[in-house]
Amino acid sequence: EAACGQCISLTCDVSPTGVVYGSPTTGHAWSAYTVPLTGFWDYVKEWGGDWMWEMIYPDLGHGFDIDWMISALQAGTLVGATDGSYDRSRNAFVCGAGWIIMDTTTGDRLAGSFSEHSPTAGSYRAELLGLCAINVLLLALSKAGNISSCPSITIWCDNKGAVSRASENSRRIQSGRSCADILRVLRTLRMELPVPVTFIHVHSHMDDKLSWEQLSLEQQLNCQCDTLAKDSVSRYILNQTSNVTRNQRLLPKEAAGIFVQGTKLTSDPTTALRYLLGKHAAKQFLCSEQG
């Protein structure tokens, strides 16, 4: 019953061996217990970007076992949903993403959330980060299950811009595009994935207009992802971890990144590099006898 509850967002702490559950803010009651991690997550983290997995909510029935996800992937019953959160009034440099992977036959699900500190933080970037996280998991699951082909997987997202960009099949990402770093990773994942992925737009905040029972599956998942994403931003603001560390994070499968004064550039580096070189030249001139 709890695994199919209406509430994914939990009050929880992380222990070295897994996630310790407390009580949810809404929905069904959850029992407090610890779920051990599996080697699968160590494998995922080898691709880099382990900060994306800062909070994982395993299915209460299966824990961190991945067999049900591999079976659902092969059967074509696995779906994904993601949502982003950005609140400029609270912190203009932080955005968060929440995601859910679910087996539509059994209702089993895996959820997660994470935040990123970046000068280019925003709703669009948050949505792309969520799409990236799900695609990383799909690739890892396909490799863990030795899957060479399977039915198409649907991922729902409420940002039309993110859905449009993620759906493109371009082999080259223009450096001037917003969030070009994430788009490049999505391209890499798409080229490696043996699983065809379909990105579909879903209307957001439909729970403001309809009761929970009236919502479609994708709308319910979107509402849950919205809560997860908001929680990840709140978690960052409460913890206020080092901004320097946050700015230096690479994405999974991201071979290289450009950093200027400790901050990662997510798009065309020309402007930032020109400014930095100009600043350096001005400093040298003003500190010289001529200046």
Model-derived features: where do they sit?
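Helix/loop segments that flank and initiate small ligand/metal-binding modules
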Residues: 242-291
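RNase H-like nuclease fold core
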Residues: 35, 52, 57-146, 167, ...
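Charge-dense, extended regions
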Residues: 1-45
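Acidic, Mg2+-coordinating catalytic module of metal-dependent nucleases/exonucleases
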Residues: 219-238
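Eukaryotic N-terminal low-complexity, Ser/Thr- and Lys/Arg-rich leader segments
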Residues: 28-69, 261, 268
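Extended low-polarity, hydrophobic cluster-rich segments
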Residues: 4, 132-140, 273-282
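RNase H catalytic domain
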Residues: 86-89, 131-223, 241
